[in-house]
Curated annotation (Swiss-Prot):
This is Glycerol-3-phosphate dehydrogenase [NAD(P)+]. The gene is gpsA. It comes from the Bacteria. It is found in: Cytoplasm. Keywords: Cytoplasm, Lipid biosynthesis, Lipid metabolism, NAD, NADP, Nucleotide-binding, Oxidoreductase, Phospholipid biosynthesis, Phospholipid metabolism. It holds the Pfam family NAD_Gly3P_dh_C. It comes from Oceanobacillus iheyensis (strain DSM 14371 / CIP 107618 / JCM 11309 / KCTC 3954 / HTE831). It catalyses: sn-glycerol 3-phosphate + NAD(+) = dihydroxyacetone phosphate + NADH + H(+); sn-glycerol 3-phosphate + NADP(+) = dihydroxyacetone phosphate + NADPH + H(+). GO terms for molecular function: glycerol-3-phosphate dehydrogenase [NAD(P)+] activity; NAD binding.
Amino acid sequence: MEKVAVLGAGSWGTALAIVLADNGHEVRLWSHRKEHAETINETHRNHKYLDVDIPNEITAYSDMHQTVSGVDAVVIVVPTKAIREVCSELNKWMDSKTTVIHATKGIEPVSLKRVSEMIEEEMDIKYEDIVVLSGPSHAEEVALRHPTTVTTSSINLEKAKHAQDLFSSDSFRVYTSDDILGIELGGALKNIIALGAGISDGLGFGDNAKAALITRGLAEIARLGTSLGANPLSFLGLSGVGDLIVTCTSVHSRNWRAGNLLGKGNQLEDVLEQMGMVVEGVRTVKAAHQFAKDQNVDMPITSGIFQILFENKNPKDVVEQLMNRGKRDEMDDLAVLLKERYSE
C-alpha cells in the first residue's frame, strides 16, 4: 500500500480520500484552514462539506510540508481559482518522483489554460507525466460506496495506470486514456451545459428541453474540443457524455442547482451567495466563450448562457433565440468531426 496526499478537503477531495483509505492506503487530507483539519481529526467527519464517517486511515493536515513529505502520489482537488497558489506551495516540498494527479474540472478564464497546463507552469514537472481523474462521480455517492466509474488520463500511460491502481475498488472502477486534452475539456465544459439544464428546469420546461440541451451541448463540446486537438471519441466516454448526463440530471450537481435558481429569476450574485460553494461552470463559461471566438467555433448554447450570466439577458429570450436559429442538418457536426479525425 502507498502513502497518498489529497490536497483539498471539500466534498470531492474527502470522497476521493475515502476511496483511497478503503483501498488500504495511508491518506493525508490537506485543508488550507487549520481549524478545519483539527475538526476532521477530532470528529472523523467533515461536517461543512461531506458529512459522512471518515476512516481512521485518513489524517487531516493544514501544513503542506507535513502533508506531502514522503508520499508516493499527490491528488490535487482544489477549485480552479486556487490551483496556481496551491501548486506553487506544493512544488516547494514535493519529491520529483511523486505521481501528480488532479481531479479539478475547470478552465482558467483569462489565460484559457486547462488545469494540467496550470500545474505544469507552477511546478517542476513534465506535462506528459500529469494525470487527470474525471468522470460522472458525485462526491455524495462515491462516499457512500455507490458504484462509480471514472477515467484517469495522461500522455504517460504508466502514470495513468498508477492512478488507476491507487483508486480501483469494488465500488470505484477506473479506466485509462492517453487523451488528457479531451478528458479535461469534457469534464470542464459539461458544467456549462449543466447550468443550462438547471435554467431549463427553473423555467419549468420538461424532459424534451433537457434532452435537447444535453445532446446539442455535447455537439458543442465536441466541436470545440476537436478544434483544439482532442480525440472526438473521448467525448462519447465517461468524462464526456457520462459526466454530462449525471451533471445535467441530478440535484447533487452544483451547476444544475445554480442554473435552476437562475431560471427561477434569481440574480447571479445572489445565487453564488446562496450556494456557498464553488460553481465551476460560472468561471468556465467565460473561458469557453472566448475559446469559441478564438477558434471560430459555433457554440450557441454556451453563448446563450454567457448572455444570461454576464449580460443580464432574460433566460426566456435566450431560449427563443436558440429555437429560432437557422435550419441545418443534425449530422453536420458528426460528419465534420470524423472527417477531420480520420481523413488522410
